């Protein structure tokens, strides 16, 4: 039987993407929790270039970067496909995955920065949400009729954005401003709950990093 290990963090959206894909494929794996303040020799050895999680170790071979790992899992293991079969649809899925990956940083900066940097990040986040809201006007998934590669990569905009909003009191996505995006997010979280980490645990984790907005100011 193939040996599969995943170096990651339980509350990281990047690790979560990989766990989700492994569960879709029905792959048994060992999860090794990392401490990013005290990185293990295994992590440093497995990802000597970036020294970041997640890292998938499959039969002693190391694969880094969550989007690269997702494609590897789809090709290396049997089970339901994560990427579409049609070449055009595959290209489309990769396009949207790259878009949300590139633009998603602004969402995180909206909660983890201050002052002018935070305001600029919010504007960039609103622009991304506007584009996604338009994209989900007539569909529930990025490509086709089932959640797949691009949707998994968009977990930061779906699941984790809601967590950050609840913890911080800063709300970026409202149904008044972005009704289609919010409908997609609701469906996303309902349909894929079995693949998600504990919401309560995520709230506890992120409350340790984010101070809520003081509404009295």
Curated annotation (Swiss-Prot):
Annotated catalysed reactions: RX + glutathione = an S-substituted glutathione + a halide anion + H(+)
Gene3D superfamilies given in the database record: 1.20.1050.10, Glutaredoxin
A Pfam short name: GST_N
Statement: the UniProt record of this protein carries the keyword Amino-acid biosynthesis: no
Ranges for domain GST C-terminal: 86-210
InterPro entries: Glutathione-S-Trfase_C-like, Glutathione-S-Trfase_C_sf, Glutathione_S-Trfase_N, GST_C, GST_C_Tau, Omega/Tau-like, Thioredoxin-like_sf
Superkingdom of the organism of origin: Eukaryota
Gene Ontology biological process terms from the UniProt entry: defense response; glutathione metabolic process
Binding-site residues, glutathione: 12, 39, 53, 65-66
Record-level Gene Ontology MF annotations: glutathione transferase activity
EC number: 2.5.1.18
GO CC aspect terms: cytoplasm
Keywords from the UniProt entry: Pathogenesis-related protein, Plant defense, Transferase
KW Transferase (keyword) present: yes
Induction: By fungal infection.
Domain GST N-terminal: 2-81
Coiled-coil residue spans: none
Family of the protein in this entry: Belongs to the GST superfamily. HSP26 family.
Protein name, entry field: Probable glutathione S-transferase
The organism of origin for this protein: Solanum tuberosum (Potato)
